[in-house]
Amino acid sequence: MPHTQPTSSLATASFSARRQQIDALRDQFTGRATAYPRADGTTGPRIYLDSAASNLRFQGAEAVVEQAMQHYANTHSHLHHGARIMTEAYAQAHDAVRQFVGAPDDYTAIFCGTGVTGGLNRMARVLSAQRPERDVVITTLMEHHANDLPHRKHMRKVVHVPLQVDPDGNAGRVDMAALQAAIQEHGDRLNYVAVTAASNVTGIANPVHDIAAAAHEVGALCVVDAAQSAAHRPIHLPGNTPNEALDVLCLSGHKIYAPGSPGVIVARKDLFAHREPEVVGGGIVEFVDAKRYDVTDTLPDREEAGTPNLPGALLLGATLRILQRVGMDAVEADEQALTQYAMSALNEIDGLTIYGSHRLEVAERIGVITLNLHDLPHGLVT
């Protein structure tokens, strides 16, 4: 969503306070002070530049988990104090996810796997089974393997839409004209459009709500991979109109400052109706005997069989609450300033290439920069 700078004096003061919180958080990453050997033989604190792959943890969120683990017990029980406390804490972690993305009551948050890969694989299976007459998926040429291969495996046909190219010959966001044409071409055979909110390679963002509106015109769904974007900018799942709402949003906790936490599916509840859960086992049944079992209708319980990753879920919930207190609009504004500064400085280096378009009209960016130096192996550049 576009960032709007606060205008009132009260809002400006609040925004300034949140900027101060961001500055304070910079010193709260676990492992930031770890010393490593340098090429010149000295040692020094590491400079972590691999957040596009996985982010470091907030110490404050770790402290919340440590406190909660004093009550550790398995969930789905109210027979003793620890079980009641952990069941409630686990439910609050789900609520934190839904609040973080602005999901309304007809959406559920399901913890699934270790990142977006598990969520996108599950949704490809679910939507293929729920809508078998719609056997086509549209995706783009800027997707991570996690948002490409599951659709190839579970759908009959996958269409890869090209990207816009700027006058310099560099790739930008998805080509919306080509996307619209593909949507209209496949019409009532189109199950869903699967698109990344922002590339994990270039950091270039896509207009996901415009894409959702285009998909909905032909009765298709919009599945968004927000693994890379969630830590960088606000997410407002409903959009500005009902037609712009995202049907499915997948997140990776380890990329939102919560390594060790689960992946998350935030999706319309009705997409899981009238079907067997993807995985069956403990915690999802109302009745079991030797001849039959009755699965609960309650979400997310019916889609989360087995003992959950409680420490990871609580870590994610605590982390998202920290980010909400700071405000993702403040995070985005601070990061945009740093990104523009970094790109300007890097562009002054002879022989250095920054991948992806630099032109804002085709390449709105988050704080991800991929670069290389001419004639040097990428490992040596690193």
Label the predicted regions.
Residues M1-T382:
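Pyridoxal 5′-phosphate
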